[in-house]
């Protein structure tokens, strides 16, 4: 071990020690590495996108370490990263399909799980799928997808569901984490994903975190922030805005604890400070050339059920549910909505729930007028989150925050994650971040920009770029656009008219439709929907007590697997080939390192095997979707294209002529397993009852090269498959082999330069866009004004959330993650070292509240809302330090099933759930 490796190992050991975790053996000392094969890969966990080096010997993973050549993490890992390999070897890893059966071996929803063959599993799955499709059509099936799909997995399942089955009822768990960011991007820029990159950290003077505990959720990025702060601590400033105190505050110059939901008001305060008190700070040249001012309706509801008296609601839920129809304006809303002629006590009827994304161009003077109420005095009283903090001190913090943004030559990066996205006005608050940066001309520049951080490893690369959302197609295209469907049908080589023009159900609607009997077949991939969805009691009851069939592809028996009817054992990250796309648009590929455990097979294999079970004639004839829409018969067109109605979906969508051009004799695979291509030495008996010998063509390369056709020449360009196996990722668009660091800036982005050769910026996502004009209340014209590659500066008001603390439920509840565990803990709770470090989810709370409710440190309490209750252990002294009036409970622990308590309200535009705020009471268990 050389000095460099020794230093890195020492740093890793220190990190483990600080977390109370045993050091991985591969880092504890220099080891004999004879016969080890090291290869680059990617970390399985968050959206940072760290590079990993994986060592194998004799078909086993013997070590993992940070990749010193990876520009993201530069050889470092967080504590989860060092245990990437161990997630694959939990004692209860599922190795064979499991089906609920009765004593006679027949499927029985009330039966017990029993090991079955792949053939038996697929036979039952096919039977149940056909039954549901015949009864309910394309809307009767549902797929819970993931921001943890590999890119090829997401592309394959989208092609099967959208192109083969003609359904769009597929939605990823990224709906829970990034949907508000996506809609914010699309509404503002006309194109998805951040303008900047991680290089901004080393170039900026100011890092402001909004609802982003980067120290735990993006720890490697936070190490880069810390390094930047230490380089010049006097000039570089860090501000942390949060609803409770976190580790991210440890290096912050300013910590601002605000009341949940009032980030909306704080952004407007900053904008008001710019517009009214520092108009000289407005970059008028930038704004005039590159922006238009816009607004939209406020009567949009809260993304709950339209039927406010739905029979499945508990009586205790009805008062919150009623706010979907109308709300009585509070004193604060009377101030913030005065520009619409409204006042406190007025009833706001939510008439725009059907078109919450509608918006129009307004004049700058309208924009300025709407900001008028957001004075320092008003916002400070509204937003101060710690009742025991002095109001004048809080005002000083808000003023200092605004001053940092406004300072003439100061570079500023605003980072956010779930605090802004998991929000019933998440799209609005995303748009507000761009509002401030645009006004100051501090966007799409090195070291300056509003930067949405992704939570999952491929929420960007798969869920967003591939388009596994219920309304999307690859490369930012949408299913409702006829031209986009036409492009997709041509690339997929399927008949015109095959793709359903009606978007499918988003994540929470699939759950609600399951409860209502409108969805009866669900397939779960790479996530844990029955643990990760708010108001979980409803959905568990629906899964177990109704006439439906739930398939869960999973390596472990998490909550979703336990409520399912069929569990399919799934290969994990280093047991398959794959690719992820991270938060800075960096795409990274890896090779299969080892064989899957037991009879587990990859998700891609499962999709392709399922596709073998169905023929074109089963779905490409006339298909009734609902009372208003019938899909056309496209079989004649298919025959004209050279297909036969007897062809399987596998033959047409996957094992087609184009796919066969990708040879199994490819040097990229030399010396590596590829189970999908060759089969493997396990001789797994596949879905047809025969030993699976491989597909005989380079599946992953074919899927990649077909997928990249969508983005070429359209600002989403990706490199070819082979290139990614030679580099440590590339940030798209990749044009002529060169990655793009700052989009929309003509110095760095060839698309911006092409669109505006004589200017500095082009927000070309809006090149062909147009909007009607109006005033603050409504659109007043019918004629549209061309956007001409200009971005939008939105005005969005503060409004209360649908549920706030009251006499009966006096506390705010916030949920989230912890450093040591990933999401629902299905993988990390099975790593002994991580489990020992944090074996249970605690209820972090302020001791003042403890004294108020007669609760002491380590007491077991009930946390109860209108929807349900759970037990948790109290911690007054832990890493998370809420102010009086708020508790924080992470959701990784299935024994502290906090999503039984949470409210399933969503942002009406993005359909993303707000996990960050609901009202609860606590008492001793």
From Swiss-Prot:
Q: Where does Mo-bis(molybdopterin guanine dinucleotide) bind?
A: 80, 148, 173, 177, 210-217, 418, 422, 528, 553-554, 576, 603, 815-824, 899, 916
Q: How is it modified after translation?
A: Predicted to be exported by the Tat system. The position of the signal peptide cleavage has not been experimentally proven.
Q: Where is the 4Fe-4S Mo/W bis-MGD-type domain?
A: 36-92
Chief localization class?
Answer: periplasm
* Single GO MF descriptor: 4 iron, 4 sulfur cluster binding
Q: Which SMART domains match?
A: Molybdop_Fe4S4
Task: List UniProt keywords, sorted A-Z.
Answer: 4Fe-4S, Electron transport, Iron, Iron-sulfur, Metal-binding, Molybdenum, Nitrate assimilation, Oxidoreductase, Periplasm, Signal, Transport
Q: Name one GO cellular component term.
A: nitrate reductase complex
Question: Cofactor binding mode, per the note?
Answer: Binds 1 [4Fe-4S] cluster. Binds 1 molybdenum-bis(molybdopterin guanine dinucleotide) (Mo-bis-MGD) cofactor per subunit.
Subcellular localization(s) per the UniProt record: Periplasm
Show which residues constitute the signal peptide: 1-30
Q: Which reaction does it catalyse?
A: 2 Fe(II)-[cytochrome] + nitrate + 2 H(+) = 2 Fe(III)-[cytochrome] + nitrite + H2O
Query: What Pfam families does its record include?
Result: Molybdop_Fe4S4, Molybdopterin, Molydop_binding
Cofactors per UniProt?
A: [4Fe-4S] cluster; Mo-bis(molybdopterin guanine dinucleotide)
Q: Which PROSITE patterns match?
A: 4FE4S_MOW_BIS_MGD (PS51669), MOLYBDOPTERIN_PROK_1 (PS00551), TAT (PS51318)
Q: Describe the task this protein carries out.
A: Catalytic subunit of the periplasmic nitrate reductase complex NapAB. Receives electrons from NapB and catalyzes the reduction of nitrate to nitrite.
- UniProt record similarity statement: Belongs to the prokaryotic molybdopterin-containing oxidoreductase family. NasA/NapA/NarB subfamily.
Q: Give the record's subunit note.
A: Component of the periplasmic nitrate reductase NapAB complex composed of NapA and NapB.
Write down what this protein is called. Answer: Periplasmic nitrate reductase
| Lineage, top ranks | Bacteria, Pseudomonadati, Campylobacterota, Epsilonproteobacteria, Campylobacterales
Gene name tied to this protein: napA
């Amino acid at each position: 071990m050389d000095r460099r490796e020794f230093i890195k190992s020492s740093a890793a050991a220190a990190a483990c020690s600080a977390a109370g975790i045993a050091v991985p053996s591969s880092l504890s000392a220099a080891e004999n590495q004879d016969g080890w094969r090291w290869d680059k890969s990617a970390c399985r966990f968050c959206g940072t996108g760290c590079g990993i080096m994986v060592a194998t010997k004799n078909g086993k993973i013997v070590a993992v370490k940070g990749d010193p050549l990876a520009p993201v993490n530069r050889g470092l890992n967080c504590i989860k990263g060092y245990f990437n390999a161990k997630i694959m070897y939990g004692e209860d890893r599922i190795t064979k399909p499991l089906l609920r059966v009765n004593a006679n071996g027949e499927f029985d929803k009330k039966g017990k799980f029993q090991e079955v063959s792949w053939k038996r599993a697929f036979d039952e799955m096919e039977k149940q799928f056909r039954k549901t499709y015949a009864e309910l059509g394309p809307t009767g099936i549902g797929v819970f997808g993931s921001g943890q799909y590999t890119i090829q997995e997401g592309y394959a399942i989208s092609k099967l569901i959208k192109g083969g089955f003609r359904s769009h009822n597929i939605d990823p768990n990224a709906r829970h984490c990034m949907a508000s960011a996506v809609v914010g991007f699309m509404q503002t820029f006309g194109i998805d994903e951040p303008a900047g990159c991680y290089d901004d950290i080393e170039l900026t003077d100011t890092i402001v975190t909004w609802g982003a505990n980067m120290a735990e959720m993006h720890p490697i990025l936070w190490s880069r922030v810390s390094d930047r702060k230490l380089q010049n601590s006097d000039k570089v400033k860090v501000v942390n805005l949060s609803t409770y105190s976190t580790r991210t505050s440890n290096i912050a110059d300013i910590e601002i604890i605000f009341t949940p939901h009032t980030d909306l008001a704080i952004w407007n305060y900053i904008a008001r400070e710019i517009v009214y008190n520092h108009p000289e700070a407005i970059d008028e040249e930038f704004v005039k050339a590159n922006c238009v001012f816009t607004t939209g309706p406020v009567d949009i509801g809260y993304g709950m059920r339209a039927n406010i008296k739905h029979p499945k609601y508990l009586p205790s839920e009805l008062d919150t549910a009623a706010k979907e129809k109308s709300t009585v304006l509070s004193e604060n809303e009377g101030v913030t909505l005065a520009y619409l002629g409204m006042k406190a006590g007025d009833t706001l009827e939510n008439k725009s729930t059907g078109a919450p994304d509608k918006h129009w161009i307004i004049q700058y003077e309208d924009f300025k007028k709407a900001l008028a109420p957001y004075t320092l005095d008003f916002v400070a009283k509204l937003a101060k989150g710690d009742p025991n903090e002095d109001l004048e001190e809080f005002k000083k913090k808000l003023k200092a925050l605004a001053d940092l943004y406004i300072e003439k030559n100061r570079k500023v990066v605003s980072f956010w994650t779930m605090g802004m996205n998991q929000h019933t006005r998440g799209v609005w608050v995303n748009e507000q971040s761009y509002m401030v940066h645009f006004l100051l001309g501090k966007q799409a520049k090195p070291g300056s920009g509003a930067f949405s951080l992704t939570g999952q490893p491929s929420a960007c690369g798969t869920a967003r770029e591939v388009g596994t959302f219920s309304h999307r197609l690859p490369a930012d295209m949408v299913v409702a656009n006829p031209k986009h469907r036409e492009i997709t049908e041509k690339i997929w080589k399927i008949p015109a008219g095959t793709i359903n023009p009606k978007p499918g159900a988003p994540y929470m609607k699939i759950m609600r439709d399951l409860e209502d009997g409108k969805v009866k077949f669900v397939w779960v991939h790479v996530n844990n929907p029955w643990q990760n969805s708010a108001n979980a009691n409803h959905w568990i009851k629906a899964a177990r007590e109704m006439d439906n069939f739930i398939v869960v592809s999973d390596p472990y028996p998490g909550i979703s697997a336990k409520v399912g009817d069929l569990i399919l054992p799934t290969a994990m990250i280093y047991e398959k080939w794959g690719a992820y796309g991270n938060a800075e648009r960096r795409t990274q590929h890896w090779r299969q390192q080892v064989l899957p455990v037991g009879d587990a097979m990859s998700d891609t294999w499962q999709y392709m095997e399922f596709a073998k079970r169905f023929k074109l004639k089963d779905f490409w004839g006339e298909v009734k979707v609902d009372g208003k829409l019938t899909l056309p018969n496209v079989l004649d067109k298919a025959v004209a294209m050279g297909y036969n109605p007897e062809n399987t979906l596998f033959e047409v969508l996957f094992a087609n002529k184009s796919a066969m051009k990708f040879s199994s004799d490819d040097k990229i695979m030399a010396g590596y397993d590829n189970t999908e291509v060759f089969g493997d030495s396990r001789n797994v008996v596949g879905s047809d009852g025969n030993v699976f010998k491989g597909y005989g063509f380079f599946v992953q390369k074919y899927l990649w090269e077909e997928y990249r056709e969508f983005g070429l020449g359209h600002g989403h360009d990706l490199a070819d498959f082979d290139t990614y196996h030679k580099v440590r990722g590339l940030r798209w668009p990749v044009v002529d082999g060169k990655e793009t660091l700052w989009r929309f800036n003509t110095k760095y982005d060839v698309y911006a330069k092409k669109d505006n050769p004589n200017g500095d910026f082009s927000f070309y996502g809006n090149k062909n866009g147009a909007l009607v004009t109006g005033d603050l209340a409504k659109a007043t014209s019918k004629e549209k004004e061309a956007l001409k590659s200009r971005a939008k500066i939105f005005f969005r008001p503060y409004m209360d959330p649908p549920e706030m603390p009251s006499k009966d439920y006096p506390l705010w509840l916030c949920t989230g993650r912890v450093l040591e565990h990933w999401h629902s803990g299905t993988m990390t709770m099975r790593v002994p070292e991580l489990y020992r470090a944090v074996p249970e989810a605690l209820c972090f709370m302020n001791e003042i509240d403890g004294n108020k409710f007669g609760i002491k440190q380590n007491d077991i309490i009930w946390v109860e809302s209108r929807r349900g209750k759970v037990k948790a252990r109290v911690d007054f002294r832990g890493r998370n330090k809420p102010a009086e009036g708020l508790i924080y409970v992470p959701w990784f622990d299935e024994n502290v099933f906090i999503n039984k308590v949470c409210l399933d309200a969503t942002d009406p535009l993005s359909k993303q759930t707000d996990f960050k705020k609901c009202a609860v009471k606590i008492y001793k268990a």
